[in-house]
Amino acid sequence: MINLFLFCRAGYEKDCAAEIQVRAAELDIGGFVKTNTNDAYVIFQCFQAGDAEVLAKNISLDSLIFARQMFAAKELLKGLPEQDRISPIVEALTQVNKAGELRVETPDTNEAKERSNFCRKFTVPLRQALKKSGALLEKENPKRPIIHVCFVASGQAYVGYSLSNNSSPYFMGIPRLKIAADAPSRSTLKLDEAFIHFIPKEEQETRLSSGMKAVDLGACPGGWTYQLVRRGMFVAAVDNGPMDQGLMDTGQVKHYQADGFRFEPPRKNITWLVCDMIEKPSRVAELIEAWAINGWFKESIFNLKLPMKARYKEVSTILATMEEILKENGVDDFSIAAKHLYHDRDEVTVHLCLRPSQPW
């Protein structure tokens, strides 16, 4: 296959494109990007046939900041006839053998969502045809490749596959989360998604456990504090503004009316530091660096607000600088990852874990 198809947020195509060009070059794979603003996807077309599979295998999806999902794809199928869209798709997937799942998707745009009903109905007959051809197993198998059919326009689709161990478990790479009725703000979904994304499911009980101490910088009105409280943690909520009364009534929150940039925790046995402040990303990064150098937390999730242009370059520079500063100050054992999550808008979410080699 010659194309790598990447889902992203509408308006972030240039950032996703810039990132995949850098990552492909690191693997000495040549190609060029094809994208349009607000299409919510990027195509990286390789110069050599078969290189798309190399990228899909060797670039970790989790290591990409702006891509929600990716798959190796054939050339765009155009003019799929209304009377028989299935045959051309089955023919295009002849090199795929015994896949474990089928996903018929669209990009995440308002226009594309109008095709979602069609995609659901079309999935059933297409699944049967792919089983008959041998491209798809009779029963779903989470260890086998995933077939993707993405309709980018009426009668136009990219088809291909992703590897189950390097793929989002969600359609279009979008987790469907519901906001709780008593949550103080919609921002609560950002931290909920961040925990799901950055902390493996089998480790969540250990790393997000009841009784842990946490600090939320810039907490008002309590959207992020809410996620910590509902997991049984005790939270120092730092903000000059008022906190949600329901959170305060739990007895798990102590409100410090202070500037998050000047606050020093009275106790240093903190497992989680979280921060979602509207501030220059470099200043937030410097704040987290200071806490890390002082050894005041074990893990942190924080948001970096993005500039209007050159967002990939800005984030990459900030993360590289953070790694350099931590190492210069004797913090050598750490891991850092960033993702433009579905519930993020003009920001990216970063996870920093200190001493990941040590048990929790």
Swiss-Prot record:
Catalytic reaction(s) noted: cytidine(2498) in 23S rRNA + S-adenosyl-L-methionine = 2'-O-methylcytidine(2498) in 23S rRNA + S-adenosyl-L-homocysteine + H(+)
Keywords: Cytoplasm, Methyltransferase, rRNA processing, S-adenosyl-L-methionine, Transferase
Subcellular localization, as worded in the UniProt entry: Cytoplasm
Pfam families from the UniProt entry: FtsJ, RlmM_FDX, RLMM_N
EC numbers for this chain: 2.1.1.186
Primary residence: cytoplasm
GO molecular function: S-adenosylmethionine-dependent methyltransferase activity
Cellular-component GO terms for this entry: cytoplasm
Protein known as: Ribosomal RNA large subunit methyltransferase M
Organism: Shewanella pealeana (strain ATCC 700345 / ANG-SQ1)
